[in-house]
Amino acid sequence: LYSQKLARAFVVLDPETRAQSIWHDATTQAFALGLEVVEDAGLLAEVAGLVEWPVVLMGEIGIDFLALPAEVLQTSMREHQKFFSVKNPKTGRIERFITVANNAPQDGGTLILKGNQKVLSARLSDAKFFWENDLRRIQANGLEGMGAGLSAVTFHNKLGSQAERIARIATLAAHLAPMMDVDPERAILAAK
């Protein structure tokens, strides 16, 4: 059969089979350490489409980045590296990542993981810088101070600045809030 010939050449023909293999291996590796892979069907489908012979590898996140919010870690890993997040179910913290190689590496994945961890550290250094910078700005000026410069940022040449866009969203939020049994003032604050 064609699929068997491909398998002998290290190609899994069916993307669903690749996805199942990736998910099984990822969750098994995480479970062995008492961790959980954060479900992400879109990323799983994307990664299954990128590899022919998936080999799941688990890497570590540098200790300097473990205090970042889970959302910051997940976004950096998912969007830029196509990594799955692995969390500690007791703390909810993202502690590791899963990457998928496109063939069985000779060294068991050591070199791949070393390279991926180096690239991830650079990405997370940037994320940490922006996160800490935003926190400093909020502490100094409050949340409303974050939006002060948005009047100088064009949203669209026919729709005005980002500040005008936010004002329109706040007006809409205040209008919709009572329909959802939400305090209009809180909706306005959330919109800003």
What do these predicted ranges mean?
Residues 1-192:
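Amphipathic alpha-helical "coupling" segments that flank catalytic cores
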